[in-house]
Structure formats: C-alpha cells, structure tokens
C-alpha cells in the first residue's frame, strides 16, 4: 500500500466538484428519449460506396458497439465534437453536419448545443492529452448560440 498525494487539493478540488455538479444537474435536466444512437458516428465508422463516376450509391454506418437508446441530439453533439477534434477549424464539415441535422429534424441548434459540455466531459475521460484543451473549452462553455 502506497499513499499517493492527491493533486486535487484546495481550490482545484472545489472547482472540480462544482463543475461536476453542474454537469450532473444539466444531464439530469435533459429529456429522455428512446431513439437509436450510434455512440461513435464519425468518418472512421462510415463506409461510402460510389460508382465509377463518383456518385454515392450507398452509405453504411459500421462499429455499433457503443450503440444505445437515448437522445439523438446527444449523439449528434458527440459526432460534432468528434468532427471538431478531427478537423479543427480548418473545415466547415462539423458545422454543416450539425446544421443539416437541425434542419432535417426541426431541432433547435441551442438544444443540441446543451449536450456539448456533457459529451465533452465524457470524452475527457479517455485521457487523450491532445484533446484536453479543446474538451475543457467545451465543458466550460455556459452560454450557447
């Protein structure tokens, strides 16, 4: 048994507890849905079949291991975040994706945005150092458009 010093002492611990409570309060206030959610819908899990001219014939989502029943807006927010992590600000793909979903489903963008801190916090648990800064920004955002 070896005792390890807790790096979350003092102010850091208070801030973490406050942020966690805020995220849990937000999560508990979100509507429950029964939609099929992929859980990891990103370019790596999409197979596009095209003809010789490059016309799309079929789009198939693969890797359904993270599939759940839940709120589709949470799944969309997660995909948006994955696209932002992959493409950063050098592509408009994340914005086009989330805007298309909102338009096709008559969902307010602000509602999908409410999920961003929650999915960012979930992603942060994967401990990928290269993602930490962006995820922290999404978690700390309070007001959305």
Across the structure, where does each feature detected by a protein language model lie?
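Catalytic activation segment of kinase domains across protein kinase-like and atypical kinase folds
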Residues: 44-76
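Alpha-helix N-cap/helix-start and coil->helix boundary motif
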Residues: 9, 13, 43, 66, ...
């Amino acid at each position: 048994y070896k005792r390890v010093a807790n790096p979350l002492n003092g102010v850091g611990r208070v801030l973490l507890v406050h942020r966690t409570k805020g995220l849990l309060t937000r999560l508990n206030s979100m509507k429950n849905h029964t939609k099929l959610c992929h859980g990891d819908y990103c370019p790596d899990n999409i197979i596009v079949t095209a003809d010789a001219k490059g016309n799309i014939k079929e789009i198939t989502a693969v890797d359904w291991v993270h599939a759940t029943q839940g709120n589709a807006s949470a799944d969309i927010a997660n995909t948006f975040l994955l696209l932002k992590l992959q493409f950063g600000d050098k592509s408009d793909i994340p914005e086009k994706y989330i805007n298309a979903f909102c338009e096709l489903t008559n969902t307010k963008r602000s509602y999908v945005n409410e999920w961003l801190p929650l999915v960012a916090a979930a992603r942060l648990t994967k401990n990928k150092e290269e993602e930490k800064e962006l995820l922290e920004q999404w978690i700390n955002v309070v007001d959305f458009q």
